[in-house]
């Protein structure tokens, strides 16, 4: 399993090699930003969350406003108190595939010196069970003030993404794309032949 601290370390190494910048927010900074979704999911963990910001901004960028990529960084997902069956938990170390995709994209854009202003955001935690873990019927507050009543602790991806999407608004982005392993229902629909997509911009 890839711990979020190790993920951030790898990102910093890649940033040095390929030329993008990286900033890692610790728990104190996340609390200051009032990221209740990320903090709520992290309550059951014995290690703190991180929030990672990757930036590729060349001087010749063709876009003044950034393209923002948001990746779900749940490093291991037990489902929390809405516990997954054991056979569904086997591959949950890959629940950070969205985070990996965002980091890989930033790396590729920087390595190829593409003239695009791109920001990557990765909220990172795991979703575990403990005496402190969040439970069904808890009310949490996202960083933009939106309140959420928890009905299933295994819907944690939406919560961490909500804080990241709220954070992205400050950049006035040209386009936002989030990437996440959110539901097995998507695989039931597409199998291995595609991905489930939704959006509000037909021209994107």
Predicted features along the sequence, with ranges:
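A generic structural signal for tightly packed, nonpolar segments enriched in small/aliphatic residues
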Residues: 7-204
């Amino acid at each position: 399993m890839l711990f979020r601290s190790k993920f951030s370390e790898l990102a910093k190494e890649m940033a040095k090699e390929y030329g993008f910048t990286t900033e890692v927010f610790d728990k104190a900074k996340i609390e200051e930003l009032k990221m209740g979704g990320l903090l709520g999911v992290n309550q059951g963990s014995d290690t703190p969350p991180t929030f990672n910001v990757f930036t590729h901004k060349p001087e010749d960028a063709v876009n003044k406003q950034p393209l923002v990529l948001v990746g779900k960084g749940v490093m291991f997902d037990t489902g929390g108190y809405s516990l997954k069956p054991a056979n569904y938990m086997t591959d949950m170390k890959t629940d950070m595939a969205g985070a990996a995709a965002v980091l890989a994209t930033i790396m590729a854009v920087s390595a190829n010196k593409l003239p695009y202003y791109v920001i990557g955001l990765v909220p990172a935690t795991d979703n575990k069970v403990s005496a402190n873990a969040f439970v069904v019927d808890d009310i949490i507050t996202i960083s933009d003030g939106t309140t959420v009543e928890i009905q299933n602790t295994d819907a944690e991806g939406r919560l961490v993404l909500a804080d990241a999407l709220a954070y992205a608004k400050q950049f006035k982005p040209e386009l936002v794309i989030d990437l996440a392993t959110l539901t097995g229902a998507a695989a039931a629909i597409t199998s291995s032949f595609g991905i489930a997509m939704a959006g509000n911009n037909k021209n994107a």
